[in-house]
A protein has these predicted regions:
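Conserved SAM-binding motif I beta-strand of class I
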Residues: 43-48
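Conserved class I S-adenosyl-L-methionine
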Residues: 16-28
Length: 162
């Protein structure tokens, strides 16, 4: 499973985190469910600018009886990331550059940003971003989640706030 491969590669960053947020969690936040299973003590937040997505995600966690995930209807360009240790930006989040600028303005030094960016056919669906233009982040790692290079839609960049 691509998500499992991806998170095994970034485990060292998540294991140090106390507060995690996913920007663009969507209606079925499978990434958050995996993180919740692996990191039960982690304070987890999912945000999305779609009220319908958040309503659906809240109904789903209620059915699953998950207690340590909170969801908020808010755009990633308006969130205050000052108390967040790890930020995960979903592949379909747009505009990614504005979200990254907001993170750079509000997060503390050392915050880890897990940024999914499109490759190959993924660029048809999602926006790429040049994080280097912002000069606020160092590239720590690059993770290609799929072992099958014909099936790659995105890669994960691990950034750290300077």
């Amino acid at each position: 499973n691509d998500i499992i491969n991806e998170f095994q590669s970034i485990d060292k960053y998540l294991s140090k985190s106390k507060k995690f947020i996913m920007v663009g969690c969507g209606s079925f936040p499978l990434t958050l469910f995996y993180i919740r299973e692996k990191y039960s003590k982690l304070n987890i937040i999912g945000i999305d600018n779609s009220p319908e997505a958040i309503i659906n995600a809240k109904m789903l966690i209620k059915k699953l009886m998950f207690s340590n995930i909170r969801f908020d209807i808010i755009d990633g360009i308006n969130y205050d990331y000052s108390d967040i240790d790890t930020v995960f930006i979903a592949n379909l989040v747009m505009p990614k550059t504005k979200v990254l600028k907001r993170i750079a303005m509000t997060c503390k030094s050392g915050t880890i940003i897990l940024l999914r960016v499109p490759v190959m056919y993924g660029a048809l669906l999602s926006e790429d971003v040049n994080y280097m233009e912002l000069q606020s982040f160092d590239l720590v790692d690059e993770v290609i989640p799929s072992k099958d290079t014909d099936d790659i839609l995105y890669k994960l960049l691990v950034l750290e706030k300077k």
